[in-house]
Amino acid sequence: MLHQNIETFIGCESSYADADIVLYGAPFDSTTSYRPGARFGPAAMRHESYGLETYSPYQDKDLTDIKVFDSGDMELCFGSSESALKDIEARAETILQDGKFPLLLGGEHLVTLGAVRAAARKYPAMHIIHFDAHAGLRQDYLGAELSHACVLRRCHDILGDGRIHQFCIRSGDREEFTFAKTHTEMHKFDFSGLEALAAELCRTQMPVYLTIDLDCLDPSCFPGTGTPEAGGVTFMQLLNAILTVSKTNIIGADVNELAPMLDASGVSTAMACKVLRELLLALNV
């Protein structure tokens, strides 16, 4: 049994037993390659959420109408990526075994790997839909294979070819883009192709894991992230993409790479909260 967090994300006050969705935070950023601070993301989102309404005029839904349990942040070993990933994997596995939907808050993008390990064990035919500025397909980064720069490559090690679908990608080295041509389905710069993919996944009812790196957003509206990349999408484009993916058989998700201290205005944290609210309300669980 997981215990109630003291400061929950707004509207997420269900008991664990009654909840359909379980939030769990992974405050980890030890492999950050540029600007650290993503470990403060989950707590900042919870605190900032109380400046947000529980009601979404975009979807005409309210967080008080759904059952979400916020289990707070995990205690993770900053000095060991594998140890942290094992803890995240164990938490995700518990939530899945209890028949609930796991929604992970990062933290840097490497934390996704722990959740994917657990989800793929329960759903071997799983696909990943990946929103990000960065390909994340390096074999290693400065010799480290467990890095946020390698997270989708490690996910590919688990799932194999043709089951990772990448959108908004606009940064990476030549080898990553070459790898993607034969091993993943990459859509550069925006969400072109997402509706067709979602329709096919709906038809086949394949399990889908959704991972959202918030740096898919343009830094003009979301500067508070470790590796900002010009040329990103808008909030409304991301919201419409989330609503499109919500029609598929989503079995797990994460939102990651908010580094709140890198945006003194607080706009990035407010944006992250709104993305999370809309994702929670879009899930059909």
Model-derived segments and spans:
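Conserved alpha-helical scaffold segments that buttress catalytic/binding sites
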Residues: 2-285
